[in-house]
């Protein structure tokens, strides 16, 4: 059975959270259990080095990647030095890597997938973790495509409704069939102003009815035929 696209997938692991909890200092470990994580990424390489070689020194407070960080990333590194050390090790490698891009404790994180080539870093995807759920952020192309499809559908429905209401008569030309609108119950504060609304509506309906009685479609057709048969007089 084919797997759904990653941008349509929601993943969570209650068992993992029950065993280890979910906090900022282990959110990347939680993310690495999801199908969004690439097992060939540099994060996995660094993790294997930590587990088997045990050669990584303790994280010093001054350890920082070479690139100048943003204020938000600087705050993450200051509060969680392990992430500063992780990105220092990732900066030595080339390829796919995952970094913690945004933190809003206690239940929202953004993980960024990026490709590193020396000092050049290209963002590929963002993933957001809300509570225990992990999602892939949609691309700008997917968002625009969805909005255009929705706009086209509703525009087509509106044009179809307008076409069904359109009528054409030789004497009167194009017109639209009147549509009855459901009356809306006014609020209690507008009782005085709404009292005159039925009277005004009745007056307008009466005037429209009288006009339609005088100028019927048959009369308009006869007037048009008479105007066609008449001889124009030019001054």
Swiss-Prot record:
Keyword list, A-Z: Activator, Nucleus, Transcription, Transcription regulation
GO molecular function, one term: transcription coactivator activity
InterPro entries membership: Mediator_Med6 (IPR007018), Mediator_Med6_fun (IPR016612), Mediator_Med6_sf (IPR038566)
Main subcellular localisation: nucleus
GO cellular component: core mediator complex; mediator complex
Subunit-structure text: Component of the Mediator complex.
Protein role: Component of the Mediator complex, a coactivator involved in the regulated transcription of nearly all RNA polymerase II-dependent genes. Mediator functions as a bridge to convey information from gene-specific regulatory proteins to the basal RNA polymerase II transcription machinery. Mediator is recruited to promoters by direct interactions with regulatory proteins and serves as a scaffold for the assembly of a functional preinitiation complex with RNA polymerase II and the general transcription factors.
Matches recorded under PANTHER family: MED-6-RELATED
UniProt similarity note: Belongs to the Mediator complex subunit 6 family.
Protein name listed in UniProt: Mediator of RNA polymerase II transcription subunit 6
Organism: Eremothecium gossypii (strain ATCC 10895 / CBS 109.51 / FGSC 9923 / NRRL Y-1056)
Lineage of source species: Eukaryota, Fungi, Dikarya, Ascomycota, Saccharomycotina
């Amino acid at each position: 059975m084919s797997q759904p696209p990653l941008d349509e997938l929601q993943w969570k692991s209650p068992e993992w959270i029950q065993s280890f909890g979910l906090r900022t200092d282990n959110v990347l470990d939680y993310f690495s259990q999801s199908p969004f994580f690439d097992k060939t990424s540099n994060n996995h390489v660094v993790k294997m080095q930590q587990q088997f070689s045990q050669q990584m020194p303790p994280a010093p407070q001054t350890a920082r990647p070479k690139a100048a960080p943003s204020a938000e990333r600087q705050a993450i590194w200051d509060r969680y030095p392990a992430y500063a050390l992780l990105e220092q090790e990732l900066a030595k490698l080339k390829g796919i890597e995952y970094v913690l891009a945004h933190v809003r404790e206690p239940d929202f994180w953004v993980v960024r997938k990026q490709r590193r080539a020396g000092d050049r870093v290209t963002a590929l995807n963002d993933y957001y973790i809300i509570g225990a759920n992990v999602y892939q952020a949609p691309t700008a192309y997917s968002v625009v495509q969805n909005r255009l499809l929705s706009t086209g559908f509703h525009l087509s429905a509106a044009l179809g409704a307008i076409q069904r209401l359109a009528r054409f008569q030789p004497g009167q030309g194009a017109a639209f069939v009147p549509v009855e609108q459901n009356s809306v119950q006014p609020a209690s504060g507008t009782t005085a102003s709404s009292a005159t609304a039925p009277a005004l509506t009745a007056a307008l309906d009466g005037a429209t009815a009288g006009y339609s009685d005088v100028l019927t479609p048959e009369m308009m057709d006869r007037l048009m035929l008479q105007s066609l048969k008449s001889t124009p007089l030019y001054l």
